[in-house]
A protein has these predicted regions:
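Acidic, metal-coordinating helix/loop segments flanking the phosphotransfer/catalytic sites
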Residues: 31-50
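The feature encodes the CheY-like receiver
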Residues: 15, 55-58
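Acidic catalytic/metal-coordinating carboxylates
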Residues: 33-34, 61-64
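Alpha4 helix (beta4-alpha4-beta5 surface) of REC/receiver domains from two-component response regulators
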Residues: 64, 85-100
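Short amphipathic alpha-helix used as the core "switch/output" element in two-component signaling
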Residues: 63-75
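Two-component/phosphorelay signaling modules centered on CheY-like receiver
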Residues: 12-30, 96
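C-terminal output helix
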Residues: 88, 106-116
Length: 126
């Protein structure tokens, strides 16, 4: 069964581009333009195997969204993305439990490496 990845980015081109790319690799996707729209969709949160979240969103920012997700879900795997990230943002993302912090424009090979790594670690026997 294909894994479902949720993309949250207020830039339509990034959001749809990532969703289309992920679908072309066989993943199911849900895409949201705001933190609030995702938090209002229990089904999307419950079925997500991974979250890709932009830091700068209208309304609640991506870090705050990830904090909300960690309160609702047990260790949600998240990749945080940002068009203007710095070292303090990178450290904060990892402190929150993100599996990666990627600058925009996203290097697709690196993105898929993190995704494959996350999904293979979940599939490995404990």
């Amino acid at each position: 069964m294909p894994q479902r990845i949720v993309v949250v980015d207020d830039e339509r081109s990034v959001r749809t581009g990532l969703a289309n790319l992920l679908q072309s690799e066989g993943y199911l996707t849900d895409a949201f333009e705001s933190a609030e729209s995702l938090l209002g969709n229990e089904a999307a949160m419950a079925t997500a195997a991974l979250f890709i979240i932009d830091v700068q969103l209208k309304g609640m920012d991506g870090f705050e969204l990830f904090i909300h997700l960690t309160r609702r879900l047990e260790k949600p795997p998240g990749i945080i993305i940002s068009g203007n990230g710095d070292d303090s943002m990178l450290r904060y993302a990892f402190d929150l439990g993100a599996i990666a912090f990627l600058p925009k424009p996203i290097e697709i090979d690196i993105l898929f490496e993190h995704i494959r790594q996350e999904f293979s670690s979940k599939a490995a026997p404990q």
